[in-house]
Structure formats: structure tokens, C-alpha cells
Design a protein with these regions (language model features):
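Short loop/turn segments immediately following the C-termini of beta-strands
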Residues: 330
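Terminal interaction modules at protein C-ends
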Residues: 1-324, 334-601
Length: 601
């Protein structure tokens, strides 16, 4: 169980084993925070703690740039359309534009799983030209790719080192199905990555968690399947933040001993929905969130609205001394088991180890969950209808095929964002949009007409993320981000952006050290993804600074291919006089020797 204070536990679970690095990864999430997505590649290169800071620097942390440059191109992230939260404007998000693939559920619900499939590869070169060793890891959670402070679950499954363990073929089938659920064309790179990882999941076996003697994964919503939940049990407990009448009427009409949910969700149930539930509780950990003014006015389902309190989903059953736990993304709702795309992991084992009491009563080292259960007392709900209409409009806009046309203009560059289909007609509601990298460049657009919004910009602030604000006249707001494919982007855009983010020559030396030092972990992960960083390099200003020269010479001897990968960047920076004095000449000498040595081998 992830507690609210463990914001980085899911990110920490992505870190490679010792002597391994990331080879490729694919993920799916319902709600997406782009800052949390920054943390994913950063997890493969940075040390993580629990400190959150930002100094407002115009430059990004060097370690974060290294992580993005090294790993962002290895990741495919599927996300439900309309559920990307609006983050603070940062140019560095440009490196994530091609990583995000918006999807819709084929049966009319939402794409709701929270899954990571990661493949690591040994860093050390094998003997006798053998392939590098690879290992798989699968994370199945209830927490989205966000920094929410909520109670969640995560199951970590590592590939077994022998022939025993559980097969996870349905996880691969899930991602293959998501390729067909994309709202726009999926690139060849993403398709190849998904096919390769899914194929690996067909044969790999994964070590069982402690206390578990059988494990199955259940993917819901890609096709019609019956509920995997047992029809009856001697004892039952359901923990679900969201509930609906049809779950208790159709999905599992059998009696339930205990139900734990959110009060506001229980309040929406109809009369008689809980007649077969013996005990009904709300989950009260005393959490509260101090929302900013705009968040207070945001619609109930705004993707940027922070989640607190209960968010875990657990279906626990006991029968004849055996326990079955179902954990994952599915809530106790009809939609979860009929129209949504969901995933549940079924864990089976002795009730004494895996049962309801073991789950709820805690240990000497952990507090008891049952202490946070309070008897439910109904309170009639009050939801403004305007909020629901804004959420519907958000999803409709996010589904539109929008593209950005990039072209040079008299002042630099311009991007025209346009759609062939009209935006939804919204009465008493204004729509504003702007490129994510240019928060001050807002433009009001007409409802009920195709989008046509032109923005003058610079090369470094061209953005493949288009931000939207919907504002109802009663003050209700919703904010979201839509990934937009760009047409006509100059080939040197990312290099130009990297130069701008690196900044001065001193920072370049620090960046170079990070690139040459694979175990670089000098910076707090949350500091990095939230923009904190020093503007000076460690250890001096000159090209003959000992750490830099020493690393260059070691790399020349041990891994000349790494210098070859850096050469285009150094050449590009040298052309703009962005390197420290004399560094270009030093680099040329070392690079030439490295390449000659590699050829000689």
C-alpha cells in the first residue's frame, strides 16, 4: 500500500537493478501529469528523495536534461484523452511530445489502467560478443502518473531468474489493444516498442510476491469478458473510492461483508443499493488539501485537481482458509467491469498471510488501516450541472484531430493549430488555448467552429502540447493539455532547444560530466522535475578542468561510442560559439583518437 507521503514510491520502483540501464518501456495511465512523466526518465539517472523545491531558473537542471536526452526516446505512454493536467509552462516538455499517445476505450468508457512494463539491459559489455543480459519488470498500480497524495496500491513483479513464476501475457495483450485505441496515427517507433515488449511478455515468467502461491492478471474492456470476481465467498471486503448502483445490482449482487469508500461516492448511490452490504465505512485519514483559487473553482473531474485520501482499489475474498486479492485500477462500478479498459492482478495464498485481517489490521511497524474506517452516515450530494458539462466538453475537444503547422514568419516562427472538425458549441462558456511553452500567449477561440489559432513564437518555444482553459460564466473552470502532431518542424529544433536550456559554458561542462558519468546522481529527483538547479558548473571554467579532462580520456579508452554519440551536439554548440574557450580543439583531438582506436579494434 502506498501512503500519501510516498509520492515517489512508484517512480522509485522504476529504478534499474544494479549494473543495468533502461532499454525500453511502455506505460498506460488514466490521468497524466507531465512533471511526473519527467520523473520517469529521471528515475533512471537521478537520486530521489522527498524534497520539493524550485528556484525559478530559466535553465533546467543539467541532470534532468541528461536523463531526458538519454531515455525519453525509449518510452511509450498511453493516456486517456482529455486527462493530461495543465502543468507550469516549461520548454523542457518539448522532449516528451513524442512519448505520449492519447487513447480512447473501444467499448465507450475510459482507459483506466496504471501499468508500466520496463526492460532493463546490462551496462557492462558481455564476453565473446554475446547479447547483453535483459530483465523485465512490470508495475501494476492504482496510482496514476501524477504526484497525488493519496492512498494507493502497487504490485511490482520482476522477471524470475529461473523457469518458475507467473506468466503475464494479458499485460502484453493490453498494450497491443491500446495501439488500436489511439485517436491518431501511432509512430513506427512506438509500434515496434510495444510489439517487442509484448512479445517478451508472452514467454517471460515473473517471481511471485511473498505469501502468494498463484497469480493471474485480468484485462477488462478490450472485449466482452465476465467479471473475474468470485460469485460467493465466506468473507469479503471491498475497498473502492468510487462505487455505483449497477456494480451491486449486476456485477456482484452477492452479499458483501464490508465496503470502504469515499463518502461523496456513497452519497450518490440510489435507495437499496447497499442492502446486501453488512458494514459500510468511509475512509478518513484526516487528509485535507489546500487548493489554490483556480483549483477551488475547477470542475470535479479536472485532471489537475489533486487527489487525496482513498484511491486504492482492493477486492478481498476468503474461502476455506484461502484468500484471493484483486488489486489494480478497477473501482466497484458497473463501468469498470463493462465499458472501461481496466486491469486487476489476482493474488492467491493462505488467508493467514494474504487475508482480510492481514490487510487491514497492520503490524508492529505499520498503522492499521482499520483505524481509518469510519461508519458511513449519508449526506445528500450537491454537484453543479455546469461542472459536468465542462468535463464532457473537455473530453470532446481532446478527441478532435488537431495538428500544428509550423512555418517561418517575419519575426521568427509561427504555429497554426487547426482542426477539421468543429469545437463543441458551449453556451455561456469561453475557450482559451495557448502553446504549453508560451503560457502568456493565450488566445480566445470560438465554440462550435473548427479550431484555427495562429501563434507567433520562437524556435525554442514551439510546442507540440496545446493547453486549453474552459471557463463557464459561473466561475467554474477546467484546464487540460492535448498532444498535437507538428508538421514542418525544423530538424535542428531539439538541438537548438537543448543549447538554450543548457545555458552558459560552465553549465555545458557540468552537462558533459553528467553524460560521461553514468552513475550521476547528484540531484534530488523532485528538485529536478520541478525546475530546481544550479546555474554554474562544478569545478571551474576551463576546458582543462581536471574532472572533465579525466572523464574524456577515460571514455576515449573505454567507450568511444559514447563520444560518437556526443559529437553532433558538440559540433552544433561549437558552431554557435557556445563552448568554453579552447574546448572545441580539445574535443576534436580526443574524438579523432577515440574513433581511430575504435576502428583499429
Amino acid at each position: 500500500m502506498l501512503q500519501p507521503t510516498n509520492r515517489l514510491t512508484l517512480i522509485d520502483a522504476m529504478r534499474p537493478p544494479v549494473a543495468f540501464g533502461l532499454e525500453s518501456a511502455m506505460a498506460v495511465t488514466f490521468t497524466l501529469d507531465l512533471r511526473a512523466l519527467l520523473a520517469a526518465p529521471a528515475a533512471f539517472a537521478l537520486a530521489g528523495h522527498d524534497n520539493l523545491a524550485s528556484d525559478g531558473s530559466q535553465h533546467e537542471p543539467i541532470e534532468l536534461l541528461h536523463a531526458l536526452r538519454s531515455h525519453a526516446g525509449k518510452i511509450t505512454v498511453f493516456s486517456q484523452v482529455g486527462e493530461i493536467a495543465l502543468p507550469p509552462s516549461r520548454r523542457v516538455f518539448a522532449f516528451l511530445e513524442r512519448a505520449v499517445v492519447p487513447v480512447v476505450a473501444p467499448r465507450g468508457g475510459v482507459v483506466h489502467p496504471k501499468v508500466w512494463v520496463l526492460r532493463y539491459e546490462a551496462v557492462d559489455k558481455p564476453i565473446d560478443s554475446q547479447p547483453r543480459e535483459q530483465r523485465l519488470r512490470v508495475l501494476i498500480a492504482s496510482r496514476n502518473l501524477t504526484f497525488d497524495t493519496s492512498w494507493d496500491t502497487v504490485v511490482r513483479l520482476d522477471e524470475a531468474r529461473d523457469s518458475t513464476g507467473a506468466l503475464l501475457e494479458p499485460v502484453g495483450d493490453l498494450f497491443e489493444g491500446l495501439l488500436d485505441a489511439a485517436v491518431s496515427d501511432v509512430s513506427v517507433d512506438h509500434r515496434q516498442r510495444v510489439h517487442s515488449l509484448s512479445a517478451a511478455l508472452q514467454t517471460a515468467k515473473f517471481a511471485l510476491p511473498v505469501g502468494v502461491d498463484h497469480l493471474e492478471t485480468h484485462v477488462l474492456g478490450l472485449s466482452r469478458k465476465p467479471s473475474p470476481l468470485p460469485a460467493s465467498a465466506e468473507r469479503s471486503l471491498i475497498i473502492s473510492p468510487f462505487v455505483s448502483d449497477d456494480f451491486f445490482q449486476r456485477v456482484r449482487p452477492a452479499p458483501i461483508d464490508e465496503l470502504v469508500s469515499r463518502a461523496e461516492s456513497l452519497d450518490h448511490l440510489g435507495p437499496g443499493a447497499l442492502d446486501k452490504v453488512a458494514k459500510v465505512y468511509t475512509f478518513d485519514d484526516g487528509s485535507a488539501v489546500d487548493l489554490a483559487t483556480e483549483a477551488e473553482r475547477s470542475s470535479p473531474h479536472d485532471p489537475g485537481r489533486p487527489l487525496v485520501g482513498l484511491h486504492a482499489k482492493v477486492f478481498a475474498f476468503e474461502d476455506r482458509g484461502r484468500a484471493r486479492l484483486f488489486v489494480g485500477s478497477a473501482n466497484a462500478t458497473g463501468a469498470a467491469f463493462n465499458s472501461n479498459v481496466e486491469i486487476l492482478v489476482e493474488l492467491t495464498g493462505p488467508a493467514a498471510v494474504l487475508g482480510i485481517d492481514k490487510l487491514c489490521n497492520g503490524t508492529m511497524d505499520e498503522p492499521s488501516l482499520r483505524d481509518l474506517f469510519n461508519t458511513y452516515r449519508p449526506d445528500p450530494p450537491t454537484d453543479p450541472p455546469e461542472a459536468a458539462s465542462l468535463d464532457s466538453a473537455r473530453c470532446a475537444i481532446a478527441r478532435l484531430p488537431i495538428e500544428g503547422i509550423v512555418e517561418e514568419s517575419g519575426t521568427g516562427w509561427a504555429v497554426t493549430y487547426q482542426s477539421r472538425k468543429p469545437l463543441p458549441f458551449l453556451d455561456s462558456t469561453e475557450i482559451h488555448c495557448w502553446p504549453l511553452a508560451s503560457a502568456g500567449n493565450r488566445r480566445r477561440v470560438a465554440t462550435g467552429e473548427p479550431l484555427e489559432a495562429r501563434f507567433e513564437t520562437s524556435l525554442e518555444t514551439i510546442s507540440g502540447f496545446l493547453a486549453f482553459e474552459l471557463a463557464h460564466e459561473d466561475g467554474t473552470l477546467t484546464f487540460f493539455v492535448v498532444p498535437v502532431p507538428l508538421v514542418g518542424v525544423p530538424e535542428h529544433r531539439e538541438r537548438f532547444l537543448l543549447r538554450a536550456l543548457v545555458g552558459n559554458a560552465e553549465r555545458f561542462l557540468r552537462y558533459l560530466l553528467a553524460l560521461l558519468n553514468e552513475d550521476s546522481g547528484q540531484m534530488d529527483l523532485l528538485d529536478a522535475v520541478n525546475g530546481a538547479g544550479e546555474d554554474t558548473a562544478d569545478g571551474g571554467n576551463g576546458p582543462l578542468n581536471l574532472p572533465v579532462l579525466e572523464k574524456l580520456l577515460k571514455t576515449m579508452r573505454r567507450d568511444p561510442a559514447k563520444l560518437a554519440g556526443l559529437h553532433p551536439l558538440v559540433t552544433d554548440l561549437a558552431a554557435d560559439d557556445a563552448l568554453p574557450p579552447g574546448f572545441a580543439e580539445l574535443w576534436t583531438m580526443i574524438y579523432d583518437v577515440a574513433i581511430e582506436g575504435a576502428v583499429a579494434r
